[in-house]
Amino acid sequence: MAILKRGARNKTHQEPAKRGGNNIKKAAFETSKKKEVGVSDLTLLTSISDESINDNLKKRFLNGTIYTYIGHVLISVNPFRDLGIYTDAIMKSYQGKNRLEVPPHVYAISEAMYYNLKAYNENQCVIISGESGAGKTEAAKKIMEYIAATSSTHSESIGKIKDMVLATNPLLESFGCAKTLRNNNSSRHGKYLEIRFNSQFEPCAGNITNYLLEKQRVVGQITNERNFHIFYQFTKGASDNYRQTFGVQLPEQYVYTSASKCTSVDTIDDVKDFEATIKAMQVIGLAQEEQDQIFRMLAAILWIGNISFIENEEGNAQVRDTSVTDFVAYLLQVDSQSLIKALVERIVETNHGSRRGSVYHVPLNIVQATAVRDALAKAIYNNLFEWIVDRVNKSLHAYPGADKSIGILDIYGFEIFEHNSFEQICINYVNEKLQQIFIQLTLKSEQDTYAREKIQWTPIKYFDNKVVCDLIEAKRPPGIFAAMNDSVATAHADSSAADQAFAQRLSLFSSNPHFEQRQNKFVIKHYAGDVTYDVLGMTDKNKDQLQKDLVELVGTTTNAFLTTLFPNQVDKDNKRRPPTAGDKIIKSANELVETLSKAQPSYIRTIKPNQTKSPNDYDDHQVLHQVKYLGLQENVRIRRAGFAYRQGFEKFVERFYLLSPRCSYAGDYTWTGDILEAVRLILQDALIPEKEYQLGVTQVFIKTPETLFALENMRDKFWHNMAARIQRAWRRYLQRRIDAAVKIQRTIKERKEGNKFEKLRDYGTSLLGNKKERRSMSLLGYRAFMGDYLSCNESKSNGSYIKRQAGISEKVVFSFHGEALHSKFGRSAQRLKKTFILSPTTLYIIGQVRVQNAMQYTADYKINVNSILQLNMTNLQDDWVGIVLANSSMPDPLINLSFKTELITHLKTLNSKIQVKVGPTLEYQKKPGKMHSVKCQVSDTAPKYGDVYKSSTIFVRRGNPANSKSKKKPRKKSSGMSAPTTQSSKTLAPPRMSSNNQNTTVSQSLNGGMNVKPQTPASRSAKKPAPPPPGSKKPAPQPMAKKPAPHPTPQAQMQTQTQIPASQSSATQSSIPPPPPPPPSKTSEPQFEAAYDFPGSGNPSELPLMKGDIVYITKEEPSGWSLAKTLDGSKSGWVPTAYMVKHEGAKAPPPAPAVTASQPAIQNQSQPASAQTVAATSQVPASFGDGLVSALAARANKMRVESDEEAAASSDNDDDW
């Protein structure tokens, strides 16, 4: 995880002032987001129990929050109302997000499946489980809608497939769902929808697998339930053509739709749903003829239900109204008499070994005839439903290229009714298999994996329902379905006998703890609760056979569509028992398990909060029961103790090797070592703590989903970061080219036209007319009129802060700190610190005041440039300027500004009518209409770099002549940094002298001076000024040979080395051994002595010194200044480095080296130390003064950058430069 770094906080920082205006709205964060109620993930509960889980679900349900996580498992509570949480905006908010970034939602599960499909190229599936009415079908619909909306579409065919997939929902709901007591849209069949994707992860095909349609519902329902939706849609919404052609009536006219006394439901609009069904058929591609045949079969089923029977004279069944059978025969396109005969008679054929026996026509009673009638209706509807599913699959398979898939399992929920028969045991068996899958893939498989991979783990107990599945489906020993099949085989002709045989065989399971037998009933202890099943009629339903009479009847039809529904003709020679319904459901369930096992599963556990379908009721007892049988508590415990993600080493490396520079380069996998070591390197380079993962035998286990999401996030950003690096390098290259071109252009322009800032400087000098003395700094070649010294025009600077507080919105032409004279009645005038800012129209004099330890600035004067009449100055080198205003009600400002000449120049440029007056006195209006004169006198007691104002008199030192000209701009040195000066075994040569009396003591001074840092262009220019002339008799405290030349230039060294005689060079080498490598810094600070007087400029940060003062040097700067403190530590401040020499104390001077060559050397030896000092110091290069000027210029430049230090800056402006 990345470490977030915060910038240092300023203690004096305050919140910015609130700005007016109503255009900007107050920032808000997810105002539509509800306040979190309970916990969104049950693994975060403080106590783990069924009751605490139930309480959390209840809080969230009553708050309108129906989704909760257990790790990656989603818990959904049916709200029985529209919460408005399935809009397009909400759907988009989940796209591209992991489940921790957004609240729990079925869209989050959908996004995770689609992301994993693309990221890992593995099949995905979602298993939606729960009892009937818990919301499984709705969850499946929302998943399909999300995937269809999220997946990209680059062609018309892909878009058509997406539309087809969505159209399967209303179509299959109409034919496969019905209203029950618990659910108004209960799935009465199971389906597994696979959405298949191509290599671009676009939906290109689909497939639907159907499981066990509840065809018994076609012929009968319990009170207040309904038949399948399509019957009510068709009877209420059929067109006039269908009503005339197929004789369609209202649902109240048909026995199959009215017997349960519920033909309408408040929350269902059958006519509107019928329109949706017709539209879905059209989208899927059903032709109009196919639609007509489907509705023809539906009409036939409804009219078959209206066939009724009466007893004839022999007590056998007879059709009550033959007009009904005639119309049914018309719809089925069969002979009417053949239909009647098939309904009231049964053909029985006897066999005698291999010989064919006799054929008997056995009449049926009313009960038997009614059963035959219902069997025909059920067979037609069941085969019609399977045909529709096959037809949908045919349309969805039309586009090739399917590679991977996402499967959505929407199957009937667990059912417990008052009377439970064969349909309920099949439904509950399938739910037991799904529960077994959940256990195997989450609980058992997870713990088995930890044990196999040798991961540290504490086993958790759970209930494995495999024993219940074996009780129902096993063959050896036989289970309930096997016992049922044996009973049917034993007494296939008599259903009652078969039921009795089955009841007797149930005694075989009496020893099973999950089974109880009760007369003609038996109890199975399912994971969801105990269910009591009725034996009567169960074996007959298990046969799942249509009588041969009816099969032969259908075979005589002239309707090609009906023939398609019943393709298999009766094979009279086949003696093998056909598969029963139990065999089919076992086969389908095992195939489903195999299919789900091949995909990466996601889970949605749905919960029904009440039996009344009320949006406000929450039945604690009912929900607590579901929490228990769904095993949520065990799931929470395993999730808290386990690992959120596991993956094989190779798959993990393939996914995340980009995160390790040691395993990849430019997107290619480069690691050649062990795959396990690659996993370690990836986790180390991604900065994943060791406690967040464990390495097994073949897999890596990551504990928390946050860590996995962090890895995924880093991987997603890898290519973005690489592209950004390339872009930065390219932009840097382009910028260098631009900068180089601009530099060349600027240089050429300056060569041709001159520098505009220097031109402005020369113009300003001419304004003074050689009347005012010049300060030394104003004569520097580097001096140029840059204008905005406080950087007011920049966005982030102290100057821009001052500008904002003063309310200045114009572009700034000139800005600098200075002083203004403030007069008080009866008291001496005060010099107050001010900031001067000049815009194209106004001169601002800004005052400052400290409020709550923060500096605040306000504009004291706002002077229109056009209102200035005169700018008055004295003829000496002082910095005072009197600004004479026209028709002002306020006194004229008298200001003191180091950059006075530049300010005057800019004012003159903006207003050419301003008069510049220079004379022995300075005049300004101290009061409106009353001129006041200020004298200026030369005084040696005045500060060297300042002046003194007292009693309307300015005291200042003598400056440079008024006609002094600015020096030429010196040539810039190379921009490259010179290599640090390293001391070799040879002694450094002394600088070249103009006379012949040279001495090796000069070379000693080079090595005996201060230890300086590696020279930079700035440090080389900071040389000390020339010492007194040779004729001076000031005594030196020690031989000047000991004083170093602290910053010798490489050129000087080369020149002196070439001019030293060979004998003298050898003498130097013999007398002075090579210096050792630089020793480690000592704890005691070095002592230095002032070689010259340094009175200072009045800046409190400087330390004034007299020649000979000894101080400690604690810090040296490349700008030519050193931080010094007195020996007693009472004072400290900055001093010029060039003014200081190392103090040797009482150490004796080294002996003179032997001279072996020439007489001048002997004469040089005989000179006294003072003469040697003069000889050594008199040869300072002529450019020494220029070096000092450059050093001071560098210092002033530094002060300008650090302009926010007002106290230091205001008094550190040495001169007008």
Swiss-Prot record:
Q: Quick one: where's region Disordered?
A: 1-24, 956-1102, 1145-1174, 1197-1217
For the SH3 domain, which residue ranges apply?
1083-1145
UniProt PTM comment? Phosphorylation of the TEDS site (Ser-358) is required for the polarization of the actin cytoskeleton. Phosphorylation probably activates the myosin-I ATPase activity.
Question: Which residues are annotated with the PTM Phosphoserine?
Answer: 358
**Major place of localization?**
cytoplasm
Q: Where is the composition biased (Basic residues)?
A: 1-11, 965-974
Bias regions of kind Polar residues — which residues? 976-987, 1162-1174
Query: Where are stretches of biased composition, namely Low complexity?
Result: 994-1007, 1050-1071
Q: Where is the composition biased (Acidic residues)?
A: 1203-1217
UniProt xrefs under Pfam families: Myosin_head, Myosin_TH1, SH3_1
Q: MF terms per GO, please? A: actin filament binding; ATP binding; hydrolase activity; microfilament motor activity
Function in brief:
Type-I myosin implicated in the organization of the actin cytoskeleton. Required for proper actin cytoskeleton polarization. At the cell cortex, assembles in patch-like structures together with proteins from the actin-polymerizing machinery and promotes actin assembly. Functions as actin nucleation-promoting factor (NPF) for the Arp2/3 complex.
Question: Protein name, please?
Answer: Myosin-5
* Naturally occurring in which organism (per UniProt): Candida glabrata (strain ATCC 2001 / BCRC 20586 / JCM 3761 / NBRC 0622 / NRRL Y-65 / CBS 138) (Yeast)
Gene behind this protein: MYO5
